[in-house]
Amino acid sequence: MLNRFIAFFRSVFLIGLVATAFGALPARAANETAPDYALSMHGDVALPADYTHFPYTNPDAPKKGSLTVGVVGTFDSLNPFVLKSMRTTARGLYNDGEFGNMVYQTLMLRSRDEPFTLYSLLAEKVAIDPERKWVEFTLNPKAKWSDGQPVTVDDVLFTYDILTEKGRPPYNSRMSRVAKIEKTGERSVRFTFNEKSDREFPMLIAGSMPVLPKHAINRDTFGNSTLEPPIGSGPYVVASVQPGQRIVYKRNPDYWGKDLPSQRGFNNFDKISIEYYRNETSLFESFKKGILDIFIEGNPIRWEKLYDFPAVEQGKVIKDTFEKGTPADMLGFVFNTRRPIFADRRVRQALGLLFDFEWANSNLFAGQYRRTQSFWEGAQLSSVGRPADARERELLAPFPGAVREDVMNGTWHPPVTDGSGHDRVPAKKAYDLLSQAGFQFKDGMAIDPTGKPFAFEIMTRSPDEEKIALAYQRNLSRLGIAVEIHTVDDAQYQQRLQTFDYDMILGALASSLSPGNEQWLRWGSASRDVQGSFNFAGVADPAVDAMIEALLAARNRADFVSAVRALDRVLISGDYYVPLYHLPYQWVARWDRIEHPQKTPLSGYQLPAWWHTSQ
């Protein structure tokens, strides 16, 4: 469940990007304005100018066969760039957490084996001002759309205009940081930035802004949902669509970029089918029957006990475990602080004490999960277990009270219960906090300061989410808190999520070694009331804003790490999430006709690099 739930949130996030790039080769130490093949946030890139392929791909992988994958949900649009279809767009078109950019592409491509380094894609060269006040791209002369038309500077200019005017968040809001965009040559375009920009923003333009075909898009209807197969510059085209059921992509045999170093070893399947299911149970049954080629597993009980069918015993189904080097994703119950019942931090802190991880892990998940504590769990960026350093304290000094003392000195951790499901110690602490917040307890009910029974709804979207919500509900009820669990269909869930129409949800945040501008969308005050943003908790805190500004302004690794840890401390102290758990690895089951590279990159397995083995 966990991996698939994370995948849902990944599919709608523009994953953020500030990097502490690592590797061995200086990117542009002598002259940062010289055109080059790569961009990194801080200093170094891992691959030389004459690299032939990413180290986590197989450049000799056969190009053949098909891949059929299942997802839970539905879709009714092929337009991922507008708010109307933001969370009901078919998977795989662009910026997909599992499938990448199959149809639309960006100027540069992110390596998944470095925190944040970009390499040439649509742009064959890049030049950047040392102060990052401008960035200039030279398009690859071979770049073409799937209809054979060349990718031009006019397409880049058009993309900027149309996303500024009609694009969804974050595209429309980000474009306000561009002072001007201009054609500087037949194949070159320069973005000049204004005072709203920061050192990361050129990286977002390079690696996160899609390039759209001017000749194939009607400006008047761009804001509408559509099922018309799009024209893109990517390796695949849409072959067929059954709304809500299936989308099929076929590899473009004339794909212009197939021999680029950044593309070699990817895009190996002739056909990729994404099948939509109502729930994981039916999806798993289809995998067992061989209808689906792979199954991305997130349920420890199923992984341990339900892979006993004949194909596994015969070696036809292989269970793979992948380790990744990025922080664990944050999964947690999210308080919508726009709701008055969750406006008081003491209330949120009290409710956070009432999730019994030890009981849930033992009874529901076979002890496979680990408790998540930090928004950058398991990474150097995490503040947990570390006292704040001098730079952190300097950043936090203007905001007294923003960080609790136990969080500041590194001694805080979520409560550890006796695992019985009846531990009185955290319950007593929660009772005391609620009492301090003005609550009373009468006739087995918690009464809020206005005299009303304390009650709220947890919105879920699957039986697996409902199961963990029920475990939480049981503990909350012991303090007289009335919780209703409401499981809704995918379309309703996405609509309510987009409009912040919920009390509490199970939310997931994809974490990385490169937190950056996406933090504004998750936590920034300006995003609190912007529908379609990812500020699910409704955070609006000057301390949070200041820490985000600090991490974006950091010019060296030490300052960057301190700023991220300071942000981590403020978020933990704000009690916006009840952190749940994570798996320290990734599980994928596959039929033996599917193979993958030996090397797993920093970010974990990469489906676009897998291939079909049968004759």
From Swiss-Prot:
Q: Which GO terms describe its biological process?
A: microcin transport; peptide transport
Please indicate if the UniProt record lists Signal as a keyword: yes
Record's InterPro entries? Peptide/Ni-bd, SBP_5, SBP_5_dom
Annotated GO molecular function terms are: peptide transmembrane transporter activity
- Where does this protein reside within or beyond the cell? Periplasm
Q: Signal peptide position in this chain?
A: 1-29
Gene Ontology annotations for the cellular component aspect, listed alphabetically: ATP-binding cassette (ABC) transporter complex; outer membrane-bounded periplasmic space
Task: Assign the protein's first listed, main location to one coarse class.
Answer: periplasm
What Pfam families does UniProt report for this protein, alphabetically?
A: SBP_bac_5
Q: Any keyword Transport?
A: yes
Q: Which UniProt keywords apply?
A: Periplasm, Signal, Transport
Q: Which family does it belong to?
A: Belongs to the bacterial solute-binding protein 5 family.
Q: What is this protein called?
A: Putative binding protein BAB2_0664
Q: Which organism is it from?
A: Brucella abortus (strain 2308)
